[in-house]
C-alpha cells in the first residue's frame, strides 16, 4: 500500500506539470494517470449478483461500464459507482462485508431511463490492513475520479467513511460545502466508536476545507442541546427532521450548494429501512429519494456517499432495495441537471427585482427547471427557493440570505 501511495504522489506531481487540458491535447486517454488505481479496487463479481441469469436490455446493468477484468475507460463517463467494504468504524468486527454487492445487485435490476447519463462501476475499494489504510485507499481513488471531473457515488461501509470522502478534497486542495443527512450529529467526543465522532475531525482539523456544513433530518432526542448551540455558533445550518418533512422543497437549495453529501441510513425510519433498527421515526423512503434527487440536480456535487447499511440487520433486503432506488433517483436528478443552463444565459431565466428592508436584490428563476437563485450584496448568486422570493416580496429578510451574510 505504501509503494502504491508513493506512485500516486508522483502522479500528482506530474499532474501539476502536465494539466488535464494538456493530456487531452496530447491525445492521451483520460485514465492515463489512473493505471495505479486498480491496485486499490476489487472487480465486480457480476455472475454472483444475478446467479448467471443475465439482464434484459432495459436494465441498468446493460448500460453500465463494469469493472470485471479491466477498469472502464472514463471517456464520456458522468457517474462512477464505488462500493465500500470498510466497516470497522461502526464498532463491529466483520471479516467480510457484502453490503456494497447486495446494493449493487438490486441497483443493476432497475430500469435505465437516462440515456444522457453514462455510468461506470469501478467495483469495491479493497479493505486495508488498518482502518487508516482503508481511508487512504478510498481517498486516493475518489480524489483521482473527482480530478477527472466525475461524480462519484459511494455505497456500503460505515458512516465514518465520510471522513475519507472529505480527505479527497483536502488532497485536491478544494474548499467545499458539505452536507450530512443523519438522525444524529456525529460529534460525540466521549464515544470510542469512530462513526460516532468523525465529524469532530472533519469540522475542526487543519487544514480545513469545509467552508460550510449543513445537517439535514436530525432527531432532537438524539442530539444534546449544547451540540446544536455549538453548530449555530459556527454558523452551520441544522434542520430537524420535522422541518424537513413539512417543507422538503426547502432542502433543494441546500443540496444544490453542496459539493459533498453523506447520507446515513439511520435518517430513514425503520419501517422503510429495516436495517436501521434504532430509529422507529425519521424520513420515509420516498422522502429519502426526493432528497437524493435534489442532490443529483446539483452541478457542484461531486461525491455522494450512502453509509450505515448492515445486511445482517435487514429484512428481505428491503433496505438494500431502498438504497438502490435512492441511487436511481440521484441519477435521475443528474439527468435533469444536464438540462440546466448557465446563469449568464439570461434568456433562459425569468428575472425579478425586489427589495426588503431597503436592500435591493434580484431573483432568477430557471425557465427549464423552475429553480431559483438570489443575488447577494456582493452581486454573487446563491441557490434559493420560491419561498425566499415570496418572503422578500413581502419585505421580509429571507433567513437563507441572512445566514449567508453572517458567514461572509
Describe each PLM feature range:
Residues 6-8:
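Basic polycationic patches enriched in arginine
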Residues 17-33:
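Short, Lys/Arg-enriched N-terminal segments with co-localized hydrophobic residues
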Residues 35-81, 88-408:
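Conserved alpha-helical scaffold segments that buttress catalytic/binding sites
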Amino acid at each position: 500500500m505504501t509503494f502504491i501511495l508513493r506512485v500516486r504522489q508522483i502522479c500528482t506531481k506530474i499532474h501539476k506539470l502536465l494539466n488535464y487540458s494538456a493530456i487531452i491535447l496530447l491525445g492521451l486517454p483520460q485514465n492515463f494517470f489512473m493505471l495505479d488505481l486498480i491496485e486499490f479496487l476489487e472487480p465486480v463479481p457480476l455472475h454472483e449478483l444475478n446467479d448467471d441469469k443475465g439482464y434484459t436490455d432495459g436494465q441498468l446493468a446493460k448500460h453500465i461500464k463494469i469493472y470485471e477484468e479491466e477498469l472502464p475507460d472514463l471517456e464520456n463517463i458522468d457517474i462512477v459507482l464505488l462500493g465500500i467494504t470498510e466497516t470497522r468504524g461502526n464498532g463491529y468486527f466483520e471479516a467480510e462485508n457484502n453490503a456494497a454487492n447486495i446494493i449493487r445487485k438490486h441497483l443493476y435490476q432497475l430500469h435505465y431511463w437516462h440515456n444522457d447519463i453514462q455510468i461506470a462501476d469501478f467495483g469495491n475499494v479493497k479493505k486495508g490492513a488498518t482502518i487508516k489504510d482503508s481511508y487512504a485507499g478510498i481517498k486516493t481513488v475518489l480524489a483521482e475520479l473527482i480530478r477527472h471531473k466525475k461524480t462519484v457515488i459511494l455505497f456500503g461501509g460505515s458512516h465514518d467513511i465520510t471522513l475519507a470522502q472529505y480527505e479527497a478534497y483536502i488532497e485536491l486542495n478544494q474548499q467545499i460545502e458539505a452536507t450530512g443527512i443523519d438522525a444524529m450529529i456525529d460529534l460525540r467526543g466521549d464515544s470510542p466508536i469512530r462513526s460516532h465522532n468523525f465529524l469532530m475531525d472533519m469540522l475542526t482539523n487543519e487544514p480545513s476545507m469545509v467552508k460550510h456544513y449543513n445537517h439535514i433530518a436530525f432527531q432532537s432526542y438524539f442530539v444534546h442541546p449544547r451540540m446544536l448551540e455549538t453548530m449555530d455558533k459556527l454558523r452551520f445550518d441544522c434542520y430537524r427532521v420535522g422541518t424537513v418533512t413539512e417543507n422538503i422543497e426547502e432542502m433543494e437549495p441546500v443540496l444544490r450548494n453542496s459539493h459533498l453529501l453523506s447520507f446515513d441510513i439511520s435518517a430513514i425510519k425503520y419501517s422503510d429501512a429495516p436495517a436501521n433498527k434504532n430509529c422507529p421515526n425519521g424520513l420515509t423512503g420516498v422522502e429519502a429519494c426526493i432528497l437524493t434527487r435534489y442532490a443529483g440536480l446539483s452541478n457542484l456535487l461531486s461525491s455522494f456517499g450512502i453509509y450505515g447499511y448492515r445486511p445482517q440487520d435487514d429484512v428481505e433486503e428491503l433496505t438494500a432495495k431502498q438504497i438502490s432506488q435512492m441511487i436511481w433517483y440521484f441519477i435521475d436528478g443528474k439527468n435533469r441537471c444536464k438540462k440546466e443552463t448557465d446563469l449568464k444565459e439570461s434568456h433562459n431565466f425569468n428575472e425579478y427585482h425586489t427589495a426588503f428592508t431597503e436592500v435591493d436584490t434580484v431573483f432568477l428563476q430557471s425557465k427549464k427547471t423552475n429553480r431559483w437563485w438570489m443575488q447577494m450584496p456582493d452581486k454573487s448568486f446563491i441557490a434559493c427557493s420560491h419561498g425566499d422570493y415570496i418572503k422578500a416580496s413581502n419585505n421580509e429578510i429571507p433567513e437563507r440570505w441572512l445566514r449567508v451574510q453572517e458567514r461572509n
